[in-house]
Amino acid sequence: MPRSTARAAWKRELAATLALGLPLVLTNLAQMAMTVTDVIFIGRLGSQALAASALGANLFTAIEFFGLGLVAATAPMVAHALGRRGNTVRDVRRTVRQGLWTAVIYSVPGCLLLWHGEAILLAIDQPPELAAQAGAYLRALMWAMPPFLGFLVLRSFVTALQRPRSAFLIALAAIVLNVFGNWVLVFGNLGAPALGLVGAGLASALATLGLFLGMVGVVCLDRRFRRYHLFGDVWQPDWQRLAEFWKLGLPIGAATAFEVTIFNAAAFLMGWLGEPELAAHAIAIQIASVTFMIPYGIAQAATVRVGHAYGARQPDQVARAGWCAFSLGIGSMAIAAALMLLAPGLLVSAFLDIGDPANAQVLRLATAYLAVAALFQIVDGAQVLGAGMLRGLHDTRVPMLYAALGYWGVGLPSGAALAFWAGWRGVGVWSGLAIGLALVAVLMMQRWLRRDRVGLLRRA
């Protein structure tokens, strides 16, 4: 390929990745904003309600995120079918329908576990009064799981068709619905009963139902999606495609669970160190979570772009799609890392009154954690981008093993050792997380570089 032609191809791919990735980043941030609005309303109920909601939310997240990973198989399977250009409409329809089946199938045991959330929290030695409040909250919040997983399936479908903006607009509307629902149900406005913490759970469930119904409306009414007839005979089982879906999705779910639960475990370690460490950790991890949404959205775009090229059997385009996404994601995280190093006080001030002398210790600790988080950002971005690129090649089982090794085999043990044995305390926990993420990032990128030699490109 002539140099000018190659340069033009790279520019086109960079523009296409950015056009696809930006709405996904914004949608992810909008979904985070729903959680933030819940915290704001619950915080007005008092510290005990806030603590109970945090307990419940941690359990909900641990269960929900496995399902999130499971239905994430939708995007690479649909993208591959579109790239292959065979019997595309039927193939895409089969995949999306089985994604919806998967959302329902997983939600049944997931909701059963959440229904017994109080018993689970008591079993892990949480305070009985907090466990009781968290259990009541979870019995309301659990109804958000089925529509949320269904929303993710339909969002993956429109994303694979490279039309992600509708999902972002619906997510914005859901934020408004969530705020209104909290105002009505938490405090008993407009004649509704004041349900407190339970009201916050119901508001989230109703807003999430709105997310799903909004996406149903889009795929049924928009002519670009309507021709796929996704809901015709949706109750008809397709066992072969369901098995293929779970074969690809189960490792994604497991890898996602490994990552989410290591952060839950890190919070427990911080709790053992003391209240100031835990408070500083909560602030630093919230900042890191917001910036993580950027490479996470770009990684979702990478899955689609790589998947299209993989289905079309275009190895050069596979490489362009992967490296363009990687460059965008790492570039964004480098900016985030610089901000954490140069202006930590500005970031912390969004969560803490840094002028209050009573907060001096938490400010000092949070600033130290953000210094480690600057490195953390780069490797966290690299690992999620690597996973997204490999997912586009339908490579999920080996990355799952990498996640298990990096997070639980190396990251958590090294964090505990540095925190308690080396005396690094909270900085040790964060350093352990960074070490684990760095290992996963190196392994993911090594596999991407060896994608042809290990036979990933020959499976299309």
Curated annotation (Swiss-Prot):
CDD domains: MATE_NorM_like (cd13131). It is a multi-pass membrane protein. One of its GO terms (molecular function) is antiporter activity. The chain crosses the membrane at residues 20-42, 57-79, 99-121, 136-158, 165-187, 197-219, 250-272, 282-304, 325-347, 362-379, 400-422, 427-449. Belongs to the multi antimicrobial extrusion (MATE) (TC 2.A.66.1) family. It is found in: Cell inner membrane. Multidrug efflux pump. GO terms for cellular component: plasma membrane. It comes from the Bacteria. The keyword Protein transport does not apply. InterPro entries: MATE_fam (IPR002528), MATE_MdtK (IPR050222), MdtK-like (IPR048279). This is Probable multidrug resistance protein NorM. The keyword RNA-binding does not apply. One of its GO terms (biological process) is monoatomic ion transport. Keywords: Antiport, Cell inner membrane, Cell membrane, Ion transport, Membrane, Transmembrane, Transmembrane helix, Transport.
